[in-house]
């Protein structure tokens, strides 16, 4: 199956800002929701080009849908792909560093 080429702007969807993600930032790890078609190489290239940093490694997780219910209506959340990006020593993503 041939995979279509994603532009670097289409790889990263949004940063994940959770309590756990903020704790990981102290270890130079940043968490992003990424395009389901993206692989580790595309994520690394996108982060390096967009934020002008050097990436040490990328871990990717496929998040499964969770069951949800609202009254009698049942459904599931959507599935999505998460990337944990570890930066090399001395680099931070200034755009994501805010007061927390």
From Swiss-Prot:
Quote any Pfam family the record assigns.
Ribosomal_L23
Does the record bear RNA-binding in its keywords?
yes
PROSITE patterns given in the database record? RIBOSOMAL_L23
Query: Per UniProt, which keywords does this protein have?
Result: Ribonucleoprotein, Ribosomal protein, RNA-binding, rRNA-binding
Key word Heme present: no
Report the InterPro entries cross-referenced here: Nucleotide-bd_a/b_plait_sf, Ribosomal_uL23-like, Ribosomal_uL23/eL15/eS24_sf, Ribosomal_uL23_CS
Provide the leader sequence positions. Answer: none
Protein name per its UniProtKB record: Large ribosomal subunit protein uL23
């Amino acid at each position: 199956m041939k995979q279509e080429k994603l532009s670097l702007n289409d790889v990263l969807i949004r940063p994940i800002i959770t309590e756990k993600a903020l704790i990981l930032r102290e270890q130079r790890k940043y968490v992003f929701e990424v395009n389901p078609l993206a692989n580790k190489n595309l994520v690394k290239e996108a982060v390096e080009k967009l934020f002008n940093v050097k990436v040490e490694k990328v871990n990717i997780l496929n998040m499964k849908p969770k069951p949800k219910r609202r009254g009698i209506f049942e459904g599931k959340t959507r599935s999505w792909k998460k990337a944990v990006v570890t930066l090399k020593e001395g680099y931070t993503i200034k755009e994501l560093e805010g007061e927390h």
